[in-house]
Amino acid sequence: MIKEIENKAGEKVATVFDYLEWRGDVPFSADPFQEVDNLVLAELAYTDFRGIVPSDGTVITLQEASQSFFSMHSREELLADKSFYSKCPFLMDEMAKGGRFGEMKLCWYIDEIDVRWETQISAITFLLPGGSAYVAFRGTDGSVIGWKEDFNFSFLSETKGQSRAIQYLNEIGAKLDCPLLVGGHSKGGNLAVYASAFCDPAVREKILAVYSNDGPGFKQETTDSEEYIQLLPKIVSIIPDTAIIGLLLSSKSTHRVVKSSASGILQHDGLTWQVQRNRFIEVPLSPTAEIIHQTMGSWLEQMDDETRQTFTDTVFFPFEATGMETFSEISDQKWKVVESFLDAAKQIPKEKQKEVLRLLGQLGQLGTQAVTSYLTGLVKGKESEDSPEDVQSV
């Protein structure tokens, strides 16, 4: 078990780990599958099950998966890793103890990276004790390809990862004769929604709910499609109160905003989301999130697809030119990597450098405008509260 999580004030807070400790012995027959269970499985999908869970449909138990994983990876190794998803395997400790997930089985694990198509996708299917299955798509890992694919969502009608997600869901849906739940965290949420919208109709009929846990949205042509609109009632979108990733692009979903013990972008880590009994603690969206959402939305609206692609390719060129595969290499090799990165950056044509700087400057201006607009709204709201005329009119 990992150490307790504290909020910004240093107070102990309850997370999915506490949920498993409190409710892990409650079977689905007594308390049906709900939002916190979804996050547990979406986070568990970050676990590296290579060599443990087969891709051919062979089923293994949660206990077997846990024993195999911790025989290959020490707990000290995981705790030393600073990435947010490195702690996800510890979920198996509590899950394997209780009656809620203790009898769960794992199967059809895939973990694929295709540099040529700028695609990183991993998925796994969890067979739940209640007779349904949760198809989980992993979110963005520490790979350069994985992060670039996230940027590609802004200008491609369909990425290769999204296409592969449809294929995977169709394969699982055709093999399983049971209700399906589909979900994921971060990019995994995007893949879960996209695959569910555009999978075979016979598979879509089996889907009870689709969970996007702080997953980015889509191009408007996707959210305007008939398939997506038909899926909307089944989409459960959960974002932290200072969401950044989950408010990117379009979704048309009604977001469920939850409290996090972290600040800023660190709220993207689902293991910081706060739980009370068997539900998340819901709160209003923070002013910071509203400002970022307005700024990023305005910025992207002013760029066509070609400009978005130019920006993405230019930003990622130095990483690719140095042969860097993961961002952890920066901390591992420090100045050697930084020096190579700067040398590669000099190879970017001057006109593209200017275009990126122009776009970043535009982003800064829009951010300033959004903050000014928000503060002006606060002042006007305060004046309205203090105005006798306004009080009388109410």
Where are these regions (language model features)?
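Short glycine-enriched nucleophile-adjacent loop
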Residues: 192-201
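Gly/Ala-rich beta-loop-alpha elbow adjacent to hydrolase catalytic centers
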Residues: 183-188, 192
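Alpha/beta hydrolase fold serine-hydrolase catalytic domain that processes acyl esters and thioesters
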Residues: 2-56, 60-124, 128-133, 137-179, ...
